[in-house]
Curated annotation (Swiss-Prot):
Key word Transferase present: yes
Molecular function, one GO term: rRNA (guanine-N7-)-methyltransferase activity
HAMAP family linked to this entry: 16SrRNA_methyltr_G
Organism field: Shewanella frigidimarina (strain NCIMB 400)
Gene name linked to the record: rsmG
Main location: cytoplasm
Protein name from the UniProt record: Ribosomal RNA small subunit methyltransferase G
Gene Ontology CC annotations of this record: cytosol
Family per record: Belongs to the methyltransferase superfamily. RNA methyltransferase RsmG family.
Enzyme Commission (EC) number: 2.1.1.170
Length: 206
């Protein structure tokens, strides 16, 4: 059932995935559903909704990633980082979260599904100092752009990009962009079977 739905949704998004990638994406949903019963990793309880609201929602960002090294801050159970890593095996992803149960889940996903381009780190974002800075900083967890840029400003390279996944846009928030940052592009995202607003904001250092 999930496999057929995934194929349909990928076709709607004009995305192609190998059989292995499709198995990994479905495997991630199945593991999230299983672990969620004990560890409360997400408020979404239904696997079909997990596929739409977590996996497909994450994958809408994939065509816009520029560079090779990315960090997903406040990743939770690995969103959007794990689906993006599955679909972009040539890129490297660091998944950052401060809760140990989420990191344990991510590491089990990596082990069982054999995903080799992910590094999970248990840390608060402001305390994490990377040895090498990132081409992209991803987040769909932060309530405000100001918080994201304030806490993550030290993570990207000088030419790196912040990718903020948002629902409905807050125009006042966009107008109050912190000093030293500029909005490069606002992209309207379309998630199959989801009648809710989704936007990707690309922000750069000035």
């Amino acid at each position: 059932m999930l496999s057929a739905q995934l194929k349909t949704y990928l076709a709607e998004m004009n995305m192609s995935a190998t059989e292995l990638q499709q198995k990994q994406l479905i495997g991630f949903v199945e593991m999230l559903d299983k672990w969620n019963k004990a560890y409360n990793l997400t408020a979404v309880r239904d696997p079909e909704q997990m596929l739409i609201r977590h996996v497909m929602d994450s994958l809408t960002v994939s065509p816009y990633l520029e560079g090779q090294r990315f960090i997903d801050v406040g990743t939770g159970p690995g969103l959007p980082g794990i689906p993006l890593a599955i679909m972009n095996p040539d890129k490297q992803f660091v998944l950052l979260d401060s809760l140990g149960k989420r990191i344990r889940f991510q590491k089990q996903v990596q082990f069982e599904l054999k995903i080799n381009n992910i590094t999970s780190v248990e840390s608060r974002v402001e305390a994490y100092i990377p040895e090498i800075k990132f081409d992209g900083v991803l987040s769909r967890a932060f309530a405000s752009i100001q918080d994201m840029l304030s806490w993550c400003h030290h993570l990207p390279t000088e030419k790196g990009t912040f990718y903020a996944l948002k629902g409905q846009l807050n125009q006042q928030e966009l107008q109050e962009m912190p000093t030293g940052f500029s909005l490069v592009e606002t992209i309207v995202l379309h998630v199959p079977m989801l009648d809710e607003q989704r936007h990707l904001l690309k922000i750069a250092k000035q």
